Structure formats: C-alpha cells, structure tokens
C-alpha cells in the first residue's frame, strides 16, 4: 500500500515539476535580467553574459529584441554573447527587450523547427527549408529557429546547401537562428539501439527536445522530421501550439498483423505451458504500449499534416482523438521544386522509346521485378530478338549508391541483366549529375516506379513535370495522389489506363489476396480498393497491351495530351507555390492559437515572456 502511495506521489511531483517549475525556469529570466544585459551591452569590450542555467529565457529576450537574431546561435558554444550591432544600438536594443503584451502588434513570434538532420539534403529537408521560407514570408515579425544535430556544419554552410540543392533562395538569414543539439543526438539514431529500437528512439526524442527547450524555448513547435516524442514535454511544459508534418507514421495498425496476439480478445488463446506464448504476450504488450503512447502524442498536435493520402489514411486511424479535440488533420503535399522542370520542358520534342527508372539501388525499389517481367515480355512477344527496334522499349536504371548495401544491390542487378541476356536493352546510369537527370527526363518516353506502397514518390512527380509519362505500381502515393486522381473514388481507381499514365501490379505484392484471383484473366491481378474490385495488369502484361495488343494507346498525340495533363496537375498540387500558399494559411492559424494558448494556459507572468 505504501509503495503504491509513493509511486503516486512521485508521479504527481514529477508532473508538477514538468508543468509548473520547468516552464518558469525556461521562460522567465532572473529578476535582475535587465541590469545584467545592460551591464554587458555597456561594457567597454565584449564579454559573455553570465546567466547560469537560464540560457533559454535570456536567449529569448536577446533574439526577440535583436536586429540580427541569427547572431544568437550556439554553434561555437552555449555561452551567450551580445551582438556588436545590438551593443551599438544600446538603449534602443534594451527598450525592444521590454515584455510584450499578448496583443502587442510589435510582438515577434519564434517558430521552432525541430529537425535534427537539417543538413542531410533529402526530401524531408526540402520540406523543412521550403516551410522556413514560407514562414518568413508570412510575416516580417516571424523568426525561425532550426534545432539541428549537424554540429559539423556552420549555419551559413547549411543555408547555402539548402539554396544549392533545393533552390531555397531569398531567405532572410538574419531571422534564421540555428540551435545545435550536442548531448543526446545519438539517441534518435536507430543504429544506436541494439534492442527495443523504437522505444529507445522515442526516449531519445524526449531528451533531445528537452535539450532544445533548454537552449531556446520557442512560441510554436514544428516537427518536420517525424519525432513525435518531442511533443510530450513541449505540450506539458511550454504549453504552445504544435504542428507536425508527417512523412511516414512510425507505427501502424498493420504491425499487429504480424503478432500471434493481435487484440485483447486473442489472449484467450494463451497457453500457460508454452514458453513461446509468453514471448508473444510480451510482444503484444510492448507494441500496445507504444501504439497507445503514439495515439496520445498525436492528440497533442494542433495541426497534423500528412505528405499524401496514404500517410493521411493511416494517421486518421491512429490519431483518432484529433478530430474530436478540434485539431486539424489534413494533407499537404511536399514542395517538389518542379517549377524549373516545368518551365524548361518542351513537351512536343521527340522522345526515345525508353522506360526510365529514377531510384536508388535498394531492394524495396524492386528493380529485379522489372527486369524479370521485362525479360518475359521480350521472350514471349519478340523471341530471339537481338537488336533494338521501335516495336518495344528499352530500360534505363538511373540512381545512386549511398551505402555498401546499395552497391551490392546494383551489382546483383547487373549480374541479373547478364544472366537474362538483356545487356543490349538495359542501361545503367550511376551517380549522375542533376543536369544528366533532367536530360533523361526530357528525352525518355516513360517513367517507371515499381515500389510497393511508396508513401509519396517524388520521382513520379518529376516524371510528370518534365513530360515523362508515368508507368507506376498501383499503390500508395502514385495511385492515390498522382496519376489521374481527381476524386478519391473515381477515375484512376477503376482502370489501369488513366488520363495521366498507366498502372500495374505484381504477384509479389505483400497485399495480394490469392482468393480473389480464381476467375481473373491471365496476366491480370484483382485487388480490392475502396470497396471496388479492380483488375490490374502485371508489368509484363502492361507492356504487351501498350506495344503489342493496341499500340495506338501510346501514339504521340495521346501521349502529348497526357503530358499536358500531368504538368498541369503538378503545378496545381506539387509545386513550391502550392505548398507556400497552404503553409502560410497554417502559420496564420498557429499565430491565432499561440495567442490563445498564452492567454488560457499560461500564468500571468509567463504570458508576457
């Protein structure tokens, strides 16, 4: 009994520390803060501002008053130094530091972007930097803070890389503050944890967010990397709005399908004399705890944005409380930087009869599946062919090798090409430049995607933007968001031919239901989607339909019309402009929520800091 009381007391004390003591420590500087800062500003030579453990509250005051907030990064070290320009400004700088009322029109807002791998240069970073740009464009008073673990890269290097790789130009660098996280960065890396990886990463996310808050507490928390455990302390301590941009849910209901005990009602099957059942029970408890913790974390998100319909559908099943709580759950397609591709594209130029596949050389991209079915297509329809002709297409695999595993996959594919005697008909383009990628997009007739359940698929968007007609696997992003989809229940969902491209399926698909295939035409596979039964061709059968059975489907005039439709669709849905417009709307909503949270959830003293 006493033990239970002690546990309850410990939980209560911890909760009060997190919800009352910690926010006071993070947000409110010491009583003599103005005198401390004034002393350093007026000191005849540069000295550090000694603030003890209250770096967050002091850094907030400096950033919110400074003409150059970016100066207050902690790249060199965590010590606080005042900008020479701010010292020169003297009394003007000190006056700007005055506490601001909630409705003060001069009050600035700090948007904290929690993205530890801000310098990595992938699709997630494209979203981050376009979101930062849009946030700065939304209001001159907005300041963006980037929480990163890329301690090897200086702020200007990171910004230059974003500009070069994603064409993020015109950023007001003075309003972008980098906060470097050094203590717990390894804890969010899956390779760090030998066992219980997910729970370890969640724990790491909590500690990393605490470090971020300790260095600088923002007014709005934005997670663009998918680290949901960061929402816990942010919501409890800072009491600020949270926006989460989710590329891929870390947990899904489908995961329980691999367990022996999938629901509570399945526990009646438990056999007390079977050791394996104890192990299975442990897995069920482990995944259930994680799953409902993820559900709880989702309920803390005010605006949850999914990168596409596939992710949105899964989040809708998991974050079930969001709608009931009045929170937003919506789709915001990532900015794909397609303006350049569209602007320079000549849709009327002649194209080579080639199938281009832009993808890293990884097993899940399923290059081997394409090779096997392409080989079958040739042997069944063009037996003993030795020369390239216009009667059938050739393959181009263009991609990069980032790891030793990627290199091994590439070597295997090259061996398969030799084994299948396809060397004349398959071309590999490895680690090519972006200019070479654009040249391929401009010259190849079709673009391929064979991945099962690719949640988005930016490569397909690039095909569409440059006029490379998509031939893609009918699943997830390419199916639900891209090729010929205007209405979720219609158009692309009832035919393998659409106004923007073509679909195929595979007998190797994990969601294949053998019971549906009994009366299906040879070469076609039946799938159920949104309560409809649809017959999709295999890749081999699709090529036969296009090149043997009815080549008029892909005559130049029809492909030109498809290219025009695809390009318009890209401009409307996947451009940077489309992203900016919707993002700024959400930023305005967050601005309103930030005022509301200050007024309703904070103490009178915390409100003005």
Curated annotation (Swiss-Prot):
| UniProt-recorded Gene Ontology molecular function terms | GDP-Man:Man3GlcNAc2-PP-Dol alpha-1,2-mannosyltransferase activity
Task: Keyword check for Repeat, yes or no.
Answer: no
Pathway linked to the protein: Protein modification; protein glycosylation
Q: Which UniProt keywords are present, listed alphabetically?
A: Endoplasmic reticulum, Glycosyltransferase, Membrane, Transferase, Transmembrane, Transmembrane helix
Intramembrane ranges in this entry? 196-216, 456-476
Q: How does it sit in the membrane?
A: Single-pass membrane protein
Cytoplasmic side of membrane: 23-195, 217-455, 477-609
Recorded family membership: Belongs to the glycosyltransferase group 1 family.
What's the protein called, per UniProt? GDP-Man:Man(3)GlcNAc(2)-PP-Dol alpha-1,2-mannosyltransferase
